[in-house]
Amino acid sequence: MLVPIEFWQEAARWLRAVKPDLFLLAEAEEDYLFDRAFDASYAWRLYHLMNDVAQQKCRVDRIREYLYADRKHVPAWALRLMFTSNHDENSWSGSEFVRLGPAVRVMTALTFLLPQSLPLVYTGQEFGYDHSFAFFDRDPLPACEPNETTEFYRRLIALRHDAPALASGERGGSFVEIRN
């Protein structure tokens, strides 16, 4: 992170004095960001692992290793913004369909089901819109009708809403691996 944590700690203190329930999200992943500053941070390592697994550059057990390592380094209440696409990656690296291919739904489900997850649904994903947006130019989303992908997202959101174990942070269940 380019801005020292001391700045963010002081800023968070001042901001929360005005609005105690303020939620602060860091577009970075360093573990120290949760030290009296941010409530959530981007899960960049997980994002890159999901892409690598989908492209068969590494084994899926690397995701499990990430989860165990992350649990050791961040508070139980901390959240990770988990995503298969965002404004940067969609523009520069291609849509989730290009990067994840046939694994797009599995990886999307992971962002909703993993512990400490704060799932991000990026522009058009709820319609299955396969398009890389221009980063610096106007590139509007066309009108989209609900479809099979919309229903997939609705089901994930409903599952997350209806299952207390899938709640974020300390309100949710624990990550327990069942080995077979």
How should each PLM-predicted stretch be described?
Residues L2-R80, L110-L113, G128-P164, S168-G169:
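Active-site-proximal helices and loops of the catalytic beta/alpha 8
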Residues L120-F127:
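Short acidic/histidine-rich active-site segments
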Residues P102-V106:
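Conserved interdomain hinge at the start of the Helicase C-terminal
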Residues F175-N180:
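Carbohydrate-binding surface patches
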Residues L24, P119-L120:
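Hydrophobic/aromatic residues located in beta-strands of well-ordered beta-sheets
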Residues A26, S85, Q125:
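Active-site flanking residues adjacent to catalytic metal/cofactor-binding acidic residues
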